[in-house]
Amino acid sequence: MSRKKIVLAGAGQIGGTLAHLAMLHRLGDVTLLDVNANPPKGKALDLSHAAAVEGCDAVLTGTADQADIAGADVVIVTAGVPRRPGVDRDALLAINLPVMESIGTAIGRYCPDAFVICITNPLDAMVWALRRFSGLPPARVVGMGGVLDSARLRSFLAEALGVSVTEVQAMTLGGHGDDMVPLVRQATVGGVPLPALVKMGWITQQAIDDIVQRTRTGGAEVVNLLWTSSAYYAPASAAIAMATSYLGDQKRVFAASAALSGQYGVDGLHVGVPVMIGAGGIEKIIELEFDDEEQRQFTRSVAAVAALVEDCKRLHRGLA
């Protein structure tokens, strides 16, 4: 049986990390695509040597020719300008929108049956534009953001509670930005609701509030520490988990930026919600019940995403 083909559109730090993880997880052959052929070729060559150490027979190649993505089973899009200190996701929109047009058009032309995962920021607007440019159905284009934000929330909660992160279940919904909605009320630790742990004295409400705020600014915290780049290990791990669920028909549930058509009262936008990913792509969108405060926060987050989408339409008439 032939191996699957994984295309990584963007061969920067996230792209290189994705390629390494895809090789280690034996997901299939890997093609790194970038505007200049040498960096992806260099990383592919280096990773081929690493594959020999790992005993992996995957074929890793680098290219600048978009035609080389033909027949891809999965495309993970990281291309574009990453965040820098003092530059928020919104400021990246005008720069990265043309990149989404180029890659989206290539996906629609060369691999229209692929499952596409977008990492490029501002994520919810970029995945919306990518789907429009590609012409792919909504179930086959998804944004990674909520998986990463939820992982940060789970990590911070596990650290504060002194428990294994595997015991913490928590989701962050809404847009992948400062208005995201960490659902701490619905979080559990070993099956015990987080509010119950507050009553038991395991953690204070103030500590939870601080964790919520740190989750919202987690990306900026990494950017400010790295200075010359944004996060790349965690985003790559998140995207690989999504790709693995698709390729293996695992039907895992993730908080991810999906195209909504009436769910949560939202239509025509990509917003972070719980989705089940299997061989059919996004196979289910799970609608949770919010309390009044959660609904208020979610509505505000959706409004922020909608504003970015309107900016996309203003910048590119073809999206209007």
From Swiss-Prot:
Enzyme Commission code(s) on record: 1.1.1.37
GO BP annotations listed: lactate metabolic process; tricarboxylic acid cycle
Annotated protein name in UniProt: Malate dehydrogenase 2
Role summary: Catalyzes the reversible oxidation of malate to oxaloacetate.
Ligand binding (substrate): 83, 89, 121, 152
Entries under SUPFAM superfamilies matching the protein: LDH C-terminal domain-like (SSF56327), NAD(P)-binding Rossmann-fold domains (SSF51735)
Binding sites annotated in the UniProt record for NAD(+): 10-15, 34, 96, 119-121
Catalysed reactions, as listed in the record: (S)-malate + NAD(+) = oxaloacetate + NADH + H(+)
Record InterPro entries: L-lactate/malate_DH (IPR001557), Lactate/malate_DH_C (IPR022383), Lactate/malate_DH_N (IPR001236), Lactate_DH/Glyco_Ohase_4_C (IPR015955), Malate_DH_type3 (IPR011275), NAD(P)-bd_dom_sf (IPR036291)
Species, as recorded: Rhodopseudomonas palustris (strain BisB18)
Active site per UniProt: 176
GO molecular function: L-lactate dehydrogenase activity; L-malate dehydrogenase (NAD+) activity
Gene: mdh2
Protein family per UniProt: Belongs to the LDH/MDH superfamily. MDH type 3 family.
Enzyme class, UniProt record, top EC level: oxidoreductase
NCBIfam families in UniProt: MalateDH_bact (TIGR01763), PRK06223.1 (NF004863)
Keywords: NAD, Oxidoreductase, Tricarboxylic acid cycle
